[in-house]
Amino acid sequence: PSLAAALKAKILDFKYWWTEPPITETPGANYYWTENHQIIFAADEYLAGLVPYYVRAATLARAAGFDAVDIKACHRYLVSELLASFTRENSRYGGAFENRVRLLVDVVRAVRDAVPDLEVSSRLNLYDALEYPYGWGVDREEMTRADLTEPKRLIAQLMALGYHGLNTTIGNPYYNPHFGRPFDTPITGMYTPQEHPLESFARFIRITAEVQRAFPDLAVVGSGHSWMRQFYPNVAAALIEQG
């Protein structure tokens, strides 16, 4: 059978994505909270070795009929963490700007070379809302202010590598979710933001708008608009009208 048919069969196979008890570990296990779990440092060799896996995944996606792939660079997952790796000393993936963006740029370049007819894009954190030197896209003196100098520099590189569109986001949904997902009432156990949701939403709009105006030829897709509820279409229309 074709690769697409084989993938579909696997997805529809219940046992493919769920192991019946007894099991020793589950995909959802969070080892961060596990007692005596040793956090393993991701050495440079390990990070460099990830690039072929991205290429393999992109190759399979194209063979399965996909037109594009999204290389995640947001919400403090691996690539996002590296963008803010100011304190990673003596590493090809930390410190200087060129080092911190290295993994993402290397992955994009490798995927483009291996699958040239596959559209490549990313969901990119523009502003982590974490104090420097732990946050990307933040003002070094005041973390409540965004500084998009480096994010825009990265976007220019990604466009040179063939990006035609980009999805923007900010903050970390697991740590400071109100920045990227404004809400009225926090979930149980979550903090209460010290600002009105409209302020959070307006900040997100301003940050995304700065990127769109800096790169008018780039299709910029915003996020975090759901708080506007029934007014979302009106807001979207106004944003498009105002560029």
Model segments located where?
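Flavin-dependent oxidoreductase catalytic cores
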Residues: 1-243
